[in-house]
């Protein structure tokens, strides 16, 4: 081989890990009539170019002692054809034969890049991140990252000694995406990106925003995921997915068991570690299914650095947390859930992200994912960055992650956290601390557009059919569950935070004072059909000094559990889908503690087993009685029978389905038994007492009506017929025409 020039300025820039265009000097280039190969391999002793069959094409001369080598290939290649050669590298302790990363052409399709820049989440899913694949028959990993403000980006990892000089990337202008194919590495490699800001300053090593696998915290590297294995995963849930696609979830029985997977089950014999996905599949899935829940909802499982955030401060929205094992483990978990008849909902946080140095903040030296103005880009309550969802690429990145959960892991629902904080520019901000919209208002127009785009995408052809979306929205924003075509946000369901706050406030009152707060239990029906609601008794209500559900109730231990049982009976009969956080189903006394577990030992006590049995029976009856769910979002499905008996703290209402089937719920929220309480009923004859939360099996006194009552033609409460009931203390009864 002949000597080949290597410009001194290029050498200095490459060695300083600040060259803006490494493909302009590295790899094969035509210089006159020769093909010159230049490479940067710090620490290499000798480099030769070899043919595919192993024959030596020639020596690359060391042109700088820091590791720059150059030489010319022999003639024989057609002009314009990519030269075919490999590099044989002698390291101090090994020899490596590998293709030259800088001999490959551009990787990403221009149309896909343009669509990503325009805000297409499918293009983000196709372009960004790390993907093990073959290029021109050569196995390796294609890396791509969006960093338009960077002056140089390198991929670093175990494969190059974390040396930012070794694998600088190509910038695809004007889209701001950097790409590189690294030959002969594959799934399982650890990596990060080394970036320099526009002024040349080196930034902290950054994890891949689109990584599909990560190290387990506190380690922070990204890992090349085996996406081919995920996409070839042996799913056996075709029947489930077909049924989901045709299910009208709004009019189906939905009862959700909310779980913090890091603490639901711990392995005490192994340092109290969290369970893996496979262990949770063996324990959580049969438990939730046996309890009669229709879905499990997982607090955020996208990788998060700080366990105390419960997952709500994620930095890797595409990657299931490595705390629970590899991504394939989560796929197996969902597969087990579907086989057991359980849907899986994941919490998703597009509102904000933490400021860990390896994360998204000032990713390329600029406010890339966040707003530059702290009045828009910093959340004062959570001390986190606010996603700039009005930037097309950021919106595409986030929605692409939601699509990934739906496609790769077959999740059945996505609950969007902190929607209210997105909708209002002045959320948790005093005057002067927020920026009005273009019309001078407080509404966040960019977030509104983003949420509509999210719902249109998840309900459109880009997503698998039947994936439901849920909004945690705590204000009276109109049209959260209205279609986007009707100027709504397009969610399938909204958490009814007002109902939860009002009813828990009522239940906290001593029964003697409840007559003065009667409206707290009835007010929810004023707006119950304005949206499609979920009634949430979530993790947020049993933490930070608020007390567990059982601890919120007044009275002695028996009265507290009786209050809770009566409340559950009221809730499961009330219009709206149901959600209960773990530990609530057996009335644990302690608050949620993310570093502990639910108080499973309480199930040794009959009273707590009784509450657990009640929740199981409520779920099964709720699923079996169409009157309790078929018209959840329609006024025709509900009517008050007794809504004004504040002196006795008694409530009664009827639920109906569109076939005329009925169920009546009667609640006595005082510890005083009511005998001969005459209740108007919408039909004559025998009514079966299908549920009594005071039943002995649930830990109650077993007071009731012997299993049935008789409705005679005695008018009461606006009905032609009525029955004389015995109302047990602090209890709810369900009656159904026999």
From Swiss-Prot:
Keyword Transferase found: yes
GO biological process: glycogen biosynthetic process
EC number: 2.4.1.18
Substrates-to-products reaction catalysed: Transfers a segment of a (1->4)-alpha-D-glucan chain to a primary hydroxy group in a similar glucan chain
Top-level taxon: Bacteria
Enzyme class: transferase
GO molecular-function terms, A-Z: 1,4-alpha-glucan branching enzyme activity; cation binding; hydrolase activity, hydrolyzing O-glycosyl compounds
Metabolic or biological pathway: Glycan biosynthesis; glycogen biosynthesis
InterPro entries according to UniProt: A-amylase/branching_C, Branching_enzy, GlgB, GlgB_N, GlgB_N_E_set_prok, Glyco_hydro_13_cat_dom, Glyco_hydro_13_N, Glyco_hydro_b
Residues at the catalytic site: 417 (nucleophile), 472 (proton donor)
SUPFAM superfamilies with a match to the protein in the record: (Trans)glycosidases (SSF51445), E set domains (SSF81296), Glycosyl hydrolase domain (SSF51011)
One GO location term (cellular component): cytosol
Function per UniProt: Catalyzes the formation of the alpha-1,6-glucosidic linkages in glycogen by scission of a 1,4-alpha-linked oligosaccharide from growing alpha-1,4-glucan chains and the subsequent attachment of the oligosaccharide to the alpha-1,6 position.
UniProt record similarity statement: Belongs to the glycosyl hydrolase 13 family. GlgB subfamily.
Assembly and binders: Monomer.
Protein name: 1,4-alpha-glucan branching enzyme GlgB
The species this protein was found in: Burkholderia pseudomallei (strain K96243)
């Amino acid at each position: 081989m002949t000597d080949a020039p290597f410009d001194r300025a290029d050498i200095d820039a490459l060695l300083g890990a600040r060259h803006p265009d490494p493909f302009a000097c590295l790899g094969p280039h035509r210089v006159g009539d020769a093909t010159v190969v230049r490479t940067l391999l710090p620490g290499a002793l000798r480099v030769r170019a070899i043919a595919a069959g192993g024959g030596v094409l020639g020596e690359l001369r060391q042109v700088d002692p820091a590791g720059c080598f150059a030489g010319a290939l022999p003639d024989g290649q057609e002009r314009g054809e990519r030269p075919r050669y490999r590099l044989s590298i002698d390291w101090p302790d090994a020899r490596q034969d590998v293709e030259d990363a800088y001999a490959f052409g551009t990787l990403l399709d221009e149309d896909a890049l343009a669509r990503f820049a325009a805000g297409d989440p499918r293009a983000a899913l196709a372009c960004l991140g790390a993907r093990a694949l073959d290029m021109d028959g050569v196995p390796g990993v294609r890396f791509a990252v969006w960093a338009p403000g960077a002056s140089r980006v390198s991929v670093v990892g175990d494969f190059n000694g974390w040396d930012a000089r070794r694998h600088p990337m190509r910038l695809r202008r004007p889209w701001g995406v950097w790409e590189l194919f690294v030959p002969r590495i594959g799934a399982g490699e650890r990596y990060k990106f080394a970036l320099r800001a526009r002024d040349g300053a080196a930034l902290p090593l950054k994890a891949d925003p689109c990584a599909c696998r990560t190290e387990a915290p506190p380690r922070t590297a990204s890992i090349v995921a085996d996406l081919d294995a995920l996409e070839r995963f042996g799913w056996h849930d075709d029947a489930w997915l077909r049924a989901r696609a045709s299910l009208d979830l709004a009019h189906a029985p939905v009862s959700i068991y909310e779980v913090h997977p890091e603490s639901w089950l711990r392995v005490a014999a192994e340092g109290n570690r969290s369970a893996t996905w496979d262990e949770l599949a063996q324990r959580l899935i049969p438990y939730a299914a046996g309890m009669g829940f229709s879905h499990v909802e997982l607090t955020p499982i996208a990788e998060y650095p700080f366990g105390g955030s419960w997952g709500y401060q994620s930095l890797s929205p595409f990657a299931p947390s490595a705390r629970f094992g590899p991504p394939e483990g989560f796929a197996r978990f969902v597969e087990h859930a579907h086989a057991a008849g359980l849907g899986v909902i994941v919490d998703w946080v597009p509102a904000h992200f933490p400021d860990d140095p390896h994360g998204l903040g000032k990713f390329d030296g600029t406010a890339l994912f966040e707003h530059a103005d702290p009045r828009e880009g910093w959340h004062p309550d959570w001390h986190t960055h606010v996603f700039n969802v009005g930037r097309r690429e950021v919106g595409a990145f986030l929605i692409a992650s939601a699509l990934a959960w739906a496609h790769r892991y077959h999740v059945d629902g996505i609950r969007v956290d902190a929607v209210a904080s997105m909708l209002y520019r002045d959320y948790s901000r005093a005057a002067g601390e927020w920026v009005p919209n273009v019309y001078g208002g407080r509404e966040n127009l960019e977030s509104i557009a983003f949420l509509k785009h999210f719902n249109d995408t998840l309900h459109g052809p880009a997503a698998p059919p039947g994936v439901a979306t849920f909004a945690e929205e705590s204000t009276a924003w109109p049209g959260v569950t209205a279609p986007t075509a009707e100027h709504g946000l397009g969610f399938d369901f909204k958490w009814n935070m007002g109902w939860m706050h009002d009813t828990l406030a009522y239940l906290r009152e001593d029964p003697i004072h409840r007559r003065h707060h009667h409206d707290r239990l009835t007010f929810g029906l004023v707006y119950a059909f304005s949206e499609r609601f979920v009634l949430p008794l979530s993790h947020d209500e049993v933490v930070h000094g608020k007390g567990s559900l059982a601890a919120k109730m007044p009275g002695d231990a028996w009265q507290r559990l009786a209050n809770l049982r009566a409340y559950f009976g009221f809730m499961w009969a009330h219009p709206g889908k149901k959600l209960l956080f773990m530990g609530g189903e057996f009335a644990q006394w302690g608050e949620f503690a993310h570093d502990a577990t639910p108080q499973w030992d309480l199930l040794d006590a009959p009273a707590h087993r009784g509450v657990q049995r009640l929740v199981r029976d409520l779920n099964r009856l709720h699923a079996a009685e169409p009157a309790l769910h078929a018209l959840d979002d329609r006024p025709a499905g509900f009517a008050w029978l007794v809504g004004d008996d504040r002196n006795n703290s008694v409530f009664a209402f009827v639920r109906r389905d569109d076939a005329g089937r009925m169920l009546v719920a009667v609640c006595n929220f005082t510890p005083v038994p009511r005998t001969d309480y005459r209740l108007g009923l919408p039909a004559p004859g025998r009514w079966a007492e299908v549920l009594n939360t005071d039943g002995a099996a649930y830990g109650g006194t077993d007071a009731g009506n012997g299993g049935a009552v008789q409705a005679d033609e005695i008018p009461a409460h606006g009905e032609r017929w009525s029955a004389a009931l015995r109302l047990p203390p602090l209890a709810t009864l369900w009656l159904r025409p026999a």
